[in-house]
Amino acid sequence: MLGPWHTHVDADDWEPMELAGETVGEVHSLRSDDGEQPYEAGLWRVLGDLPAPFAYEFGQNETIHVLEGSVVIDVDGGPVLELGEGDIASFAAGSRAVWRISRTPFKELFVLS
């Protein structure tokens, strides 16, 4: 089916986001891989205490829009990005970075393609 896709976010509509066996915030999916196209879009949030910095490899091209809070993303072989509310960034598949959430609550819109 070709869209449109729609979702409504309630307080209970979030699932834990796991990286390397550690919970790093929560995610709410708008659209996931349908088997034909590797595509995903949704929201990611971190509430409460600041998590420890974590390594992340971009498995797909990924674009983010920071909606709340701030993050420092240290891209291997690239710049250190300091992103806050309203900032948008895009990363190529295969890129690696260390993420450090610097202000909570943190929330971003993400699109993987």
Can you name each region flagged by the protein language model?
Residues 48-50, 71-74:
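Active-site helix/loop of acyl-thioester processing domains in fatty-acid/polyketide metabolism
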Residues 58-73:
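Short, conserved beta-strand element in jelly-roll/cupin
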Residues 53, 73, 108-110:
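Short hydrophobic/aromatic-rich beta-strand segments that constitute the beta-sheet cores
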Residues 93-113:
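Ligand-binding loop in jelly-roll beta-barrel domains
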Residues 40-58, 92-93:
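Conserved short histidine dyad/triad with adjacent acidic residue
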Residues 1-40:
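A short, N-terminal "cap"/entry segment at the start of jelly-roll beta-barrel domains
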Residues 77-93:
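Short acidic-glycine-tyrosine-enriched beta hairpin
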